[in-house]
């Protein structure tokens, strides 16, 4: 929704049929360029679901081979954690990515986008990307924290 005196608010279809409550809103200040692959901000009301730092390993704690594969597995792990709380990808309001090599991230944007959309569709919450020296699991290349809000 564009208003003459306020920010653009894009209402996301977060409430499924029969679900009640508010919907998440993408916050896009007037005049700002549209971001690609993330939102500048989100507003939502409901039950908050927060993950810890999620890395790209499977249930047997085996890390996927390579950066893109680790991202794919981490995103899948996040989807499973959200499902435990009854949350769906469209309930995501924030992702914080920690990577050990920013150049590796930037060199793989196309594949990362495909992996992201395969897991979460075209829903892009607020995101931050931070390069770190290393992660707790020495061979991990990426760790992602997620916050979701399930509408009431």
Give residue spans per PLM region.
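N-terminal presequence-like segments and the immediate start of the first folded domain
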Residues: 1-93, 99-152
